[in-house]
Amino acid sequence: MNSLFTSAFSPLAVSLGLLLVMTSAFPTPGPLGEDFKNDTTPSRLLLTTPEKTEALIKHIVDKISAIRKEICEKNDECENSKETLAENKLKLPKMEEKDGCFQSGFNQAICLIKTTAGLLEYQIYLDFLQNEFEGNQETVMELQSSIRTLIQILKEKIAGLITTPATHTDMLEKMQSSNEWVKNAKVIIILRSLENFLQFSLRAIRMK
């Protein structure tokens, strides 16, 4: 009798076991909780809202501030006016009136396109930052990862209206310098310009 009972129900037991395994592997999506709103890790922000995108930008700005602070703690002339000497050699993406990101003449679509294109152009400068920064590399890598995530989010918003710019590896060579002060000045300028660039983009990000 026991043998018959086992024979009859073993297929059902196997099926239930498989169902439990599949349920564990692929959990049913639930509503997003409050913890998600404060989670600025790139993998979570791909499913995003304007609020979460804004949180990601603020997360990036915090990382920029942390790197600048670390550099300034080691360099007494960290952010003085002499930086303009190094700035003349850098062609950093900047917001202009025609880009639609300023309060006057604001245009969300144009601003989003400019923001995405500009962040793509910043990639080569971030590579320079990673090569030259002698501090916490983990912070720099997290900054780059967060910016790549932001680019992906923005690309979805503008539906492929821009193409990835060509990589100019020779630019990295031109930015190199044996002078420690010039090197640090360039890093600071890149970080400060990137922060300003992101701040101007927030108006377009906040709109539904």
Curated annotation (Swiss-Prot):
SMART domains: IL6. The keyword Signal applies. One of its GO terms (cellular component) is interleukin-6 receptor complex. Keywords: Acute phase, Cytokine, Disulfide bond, Glycoprotein, Growth factor, Phosphoprotein, Secreted, Signal. GO terms for molecular function: cytokine activity; growth factor activity; interleukin-6 receptor binding. One of its GO terms (biological process) is response to activity. Glycans are attached at residue 38. It comes from the Eukaryota. The modification Phosphoserine is found at residue 81. It is found in: Secreted. Residues 1-29 form the signal peptide. Disulfide bonds join 72-78, 101-111. PANTHER family: INTERLEUKIN-6 (PTHR48494:SF1). Cytokine with a wide variety of biological functions in immunity, tissue regeneration, and metabolism. Binds to IL6R, then the complex associates to the signaling subunit IL6ST/gp130 to trigger the intracellular IL6-signaling pathway. The interaction with the membrane-bound IL6R and IL6ST stimulates 'classic signaling', whereas the binding of IL6 and soluble IL6R to IL6ST stimulates 'trans-signaling'. Alternatively, 'cluster signaling' occurs when membrane-bound IL6:IL6R complexes on transmitter cells activate IL6ST receptors on neighboring receiver cells. Belongs to the IL-6 superfamily. Component of a hexamer of two molecules each of IL6, IL6R and IL6ST; first binds to IL6R to associate with the signaling subunit IL6ST. Interacts with IL6R (via the N-terminal ectodomain); this interaction may be affected by IL6R-binding with SORL1, hence decreasing IL6 cis signaling. Interacts with SORL1 (via the N-terminal ectodomain); this interaction leads to IL6 internalization and lysosomal degradation. May form a trimeric complex with the soluble SORL1 ectodomain and soluble IL6R receptor; this interaction might stabilize circulating IL6, hence promoting IL6 trans signaling. This is Interleukin-6. The gene is IL6.
